[in-house]
């Protein structure tokens, strides 16, 4: 079954997307797992933070375009869509600016010697978004 984006304001079809087969989903999961085990994921965090900064910059540079798409696809007021698009950029920038310190080991005092908590990824993360929020999810 194909998926469609329909403008809720006028019920006009915006775009049709093909359905994914089981093989498509399996290939995507394998690709995500390969990336999770790659040098990119296990290596220095700086290149990934640079990607988040670039994402924030790209979103900021296209607020109007992205807001128009969101309004068309979800029937939102353009002002609300602009706010959501800007929030997406702010979230990406927040993590780009703070992830390194947030993920740094935290030392705790202990009478038994050194103690600390380290943060390590445990799996790929997939999020299925609501069908009514294609841009912000």
Regions found by a protein language model. Name each.
Residues 1-113:
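N-terminal Rossmann-like NAD(P)+-binding subdomain of aldehyde/semialdehyde dehydrogenases
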Residues 106-137:
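Conserved small-residue-rich beta-alpha loop and adjacent elements
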């Amino acid at each position: 079954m194909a998926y469609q984006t329909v403008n809720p304001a006028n019920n006009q079809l915006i775009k049709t997307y093909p359905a994914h087969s089981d093989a498509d989903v399996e290939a995507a999961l394998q690709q995500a797992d390969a990336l999770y085990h790659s040098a990119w994921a296990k290596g220095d965090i700086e290149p990934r933070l640079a990607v988040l900064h670039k994402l924030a910059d790209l979103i900021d540079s296209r607020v109007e375009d992205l807001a128009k798409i969101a309004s068309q696809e979800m029937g939102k007021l353009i002002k609300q869509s602009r706010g959501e698009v800007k929030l997406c950029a702010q979230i990406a920038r927040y993590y780009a600016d703070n992830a390194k310190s947030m993920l740094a080991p935290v030392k705790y005092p202990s009478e038994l010697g050194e103690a600390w908590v380290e943060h390590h990824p445990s799996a790929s993360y997939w999020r299925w978004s609501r069908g009514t929020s294609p841009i912000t999810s």
